[in-house]
From Swiss-Prot:
<feature type="binding site">
    <location>
        <position position="254"/>
    </location>
    <ligand>
        <name>ATP</name>
    </ligand>
</feature>
<feature type="short sequence motif" description="'KMSKS' region">
    <location>
        <begin position="251"/>
        <end position="255"/>
    </location>
</feature>
<dbReference type="InterPro" id="IPR020058">
    <property type="entry name" value="Glu/Gln-tRNA-synth_Ib_cat-dom"/>
</dbReference>
<dbReference type="GO" id="GO:0005829">
    <property type="term" value="C:cytosol"/>
</dbReference>
<dbReference type="InterPro" id="IPR045462">
    <property type="entry name" value="aa-tRNA-synth_I_cd-bd"/>
</dbReference>
<keyword id="KW-0547">Nucleotide-binding</keyword>
<dbReference type="GO" id="GO:0006424">
    <property type="term" value="P:glutamyl-tRNA aminoacylation"/>
</dbReference>
<dbReference type="InterPro" id="IPR014729">
    <property type="entry name" value="Rossmann-like_a/b/a_fold"/>
</dbReference>
<dbReference type="GO" id="GO:0008270">
    <property type="term" value="F:zinc ion binding"/>
</dbReference>
<dbReference type="InterPro" id="IPR008925">
    <property type="entry name" value="aa_tRNA-synth_I_cd-bd_sf"/>
</dbReference>
<keyword id="KW-0436">Ligase</keyword>
<protein>
    <recommendedName>
        <fullName>Glutamate--tRNA ligase</fullName>
        <ecNumber>6.1.1.17</ecNumber>
    </recommendedName>
</protein>
<dbReference type="InterPro" id="IPR004527">
    <property type="entry name" value="Glu-tRNA-ligase_bac/mito"/>
</dbReference>
<feature type="short sequence motif" description="'HIGH' region">
    <location>
        <begin position="10"/>
        <end position="20"/>
    </location>
</feature>
<dbReference type="InterPro" id="IPR000924">
    <property type="entry name" value="Glu/Gln-tRNA-synth"/>
</dbReference>
<keyword id="KW-0963">Cytoplasm</keyword>
<keyword id="KW-0067">ATP-binding</keyword>
Length: 493
């Protein structure tokens, strides 16, 4: 009997997302329920955005939740390497195999040619897609351009008529017309694979038997299925999980809800409660109980109990469930966990240098630096009253700074200050106009330790959360303002 093997394959391009944890949990439970194996693979072919720091955050977040893997970049295994950036020769081999079999072809079109092609198609009311012009080149022309070292990509051929039947473990057979599929790029000009080729090759070579992924990938499933057929490989069973939603039913996004697992750890949520809540996203226990452990979920896991309705990720409900877990802890464990969360030596050593020179007694530390040990803060709205800026301008400054910080890839004091400075300069203001607003939003006080030092220590998740809280306190941002200010954001260096 074939051993069930599932995997999670996140991209290390940002904070570890609760959506990644959600899909990892269901893959883990499915594998363990069937006595199988769960592995971790890192999809880091986006060399511009991928970082080892983000990769480590993924490891830490999943382990904090209690999800372990039997194979992966940090633990090794018989099917490595487990980072796609280290498997380049493997992808080159299989891309060339597809070309030799006549299922893929070199494409020499420049970015300008592709833009012009799409513009012409859109002008005609057509769906933009590659028109196959490289297929008209003779073999001699193709070889000449390859020998000359001309930059090119490798594209897959796709049918233009009929439908692809996608077997989904939740929905049954889903028919998707082939004319919706583009001639997907498989290998980029830099020699690195795109998601589609790397995904299929890795899943096959790593013996993955079942793939549980988000339903946003369902429309592109025909490309994956076609690649399995081109290679002559058995495809894994496919399951497209419902997406997590905001309370307003929109797709879960960090602009409306904190989406980083790290945020919930920093806020003092219990990992058991977080896993419990993610487990209830579109799934339920046979007896409908709300509180259950990871092992209990594994023991009773059945995909037939997954609901296709978009599960709502609601922080208030998560907080309620966390309270149930918290209050059932023995008091000794409660105290121990509290100490680990708030007073661990590593965190205290980040704070101490900024506080020590500002106090005369230990009793003065809490009033000065208590905000370091809180989730949110509750500043007095009067702290946002400004001599120079109107209330609307105050909200605009804070929203633009928040957006700039959301795009910050390296969370360092100098870069944080650079983001604030960029907004201030574009609005023709001074730093002294913006910094009191930052003090109020981040610390809840008129002054404290350096606010940029505080933001660096608190981290991106809590910093952005507090800025959102402050904006809500001031009345939020209307749709009209959001649209206008986003245009302004695009002009800020």
């Amino acid at each position: 009997m074939t051993t069930v093997r599932t995997r999670i394959a996140p991209s290390p391009t940002g904070d570890p997302h609760v959506g990644t944890a959600y899909i990892a949990l269901f893959n883990y439970c499915f594998a363990k329920q069937h006595g199988g194996e769960f592995i971790l693979r890192i999809e880091d072919t986006d060399q511009l955005r991928s970082t080892r720091e983000s990769e480590q955050q993924i490891f830490d977040a999943l382990r904090w939740l209690g999800i372990e893997w039997s194979e992966g970049p940090d633990v090794g295994g018989p099917h490595g390497p487990y980072r796609q950036s280290e498997r380049g020769d493997i992808y080159q081999k299989y891309a060339q195999q597809l070309v030799e079999l006549g299922h893929a072809f070199p494409c020499f079109c420049t970015a300008e040619e592709l833009d012009e092609m799409r513009a012409e198609q859109q002008a005609k009311g057509e769906t933009p897609r590659y028109d196959g012009r490289a297929l008209l080149l003779s073999k001699e022309e193709v070889q000449r351009r390859l020998d000359a070292g001309e930059p090119h990509v490798i594209r897959m051929k796709v049918p233009t008529e009929g439908v692809c039947v996608v077997p989904d473990m939740l929905r049954g057979e889903v028919e998707i017309p082939w004319d919706r599929m583009d001639m997907q790029v498989l290998m980029k000009t830099d020699g690195l694979p795109t998601y589609f080729l790397a995904n299929v090759v890795d899943d096959h070579l790593m013996g993955i038997t079942h793939v549980l992924r988000g339903e946003e990938w369902l429309p592109s499933a025909p490309k994956l299925i076609l690649l399995y057929e081109y290679f002559g490989w058995d495809k894994p069973q496919l399951c497209y999980m419902p997406l997590l939603r905001n309370p307003d039913k929109s797709k879960l996004s960090k602009r409306k809800n904190p989406t980083s697992v790290t945020f919930y750890e920093r806020m003092g949520f219990m990992p058991e409660a977080m896993l419990n809540y993610l487990g209830r996203m579109g799934w339920s226990m046979p007896d409908e109980r709300e509180k259950f452990s990871l092992q209990e979920m594994v023991d009773h896991f059945d995909l037939s109990r997954v609901s296709l309705g978009g599960p709502i990720f609601d922080i208030e409900k998560l907080s309620w469930l966390n309270g149930q877990w918290l209050r059932e802890l023995p008091v000794e464990e409660f105290a121990s966990r509290l100490q680990t969360w708030a007073l661990n030596p590593e965190y205290m050593m980040k704070i101490a240098p900024h506080v020590q020179g500002r106090v005369e007694t230990f009793s003065q530390v809490a009033p000065l630096a208590g905000f370091f040990f809180a989730g949110g803060v509750t500043p007095d709205v009067k702290l946002f009253e400004h001599k120079k800026l109107s209330p609307d301008q105050v909200r605009q400054v804070m929203q633009l700074i928040l957006w700039k910080l959301e795009s910050l890839r390296q969370w360092e004091k100098e870069r944080i200050m650079g983001s604030i400075q960029a907004v201030v300069e574009h609005l023709e203001l001074k730093l002294r106009d913006a910094m009191p607003l930052m003090f109020a939003a981040i610390t809840g006080q008129a002054n404290s330790v350096s606010v940029t030092d505080a933001m660096e220590i608190l981290g991106p998740d809590l910093t952005r959360f507090r800025l959102r809280q402050a904006l809500d306190l001031l009345g939020g941002v209307s749709k009209k303002e959001n649209k206008e200010w986003e245009k302004l954001l695009g002009a800020i260096a």
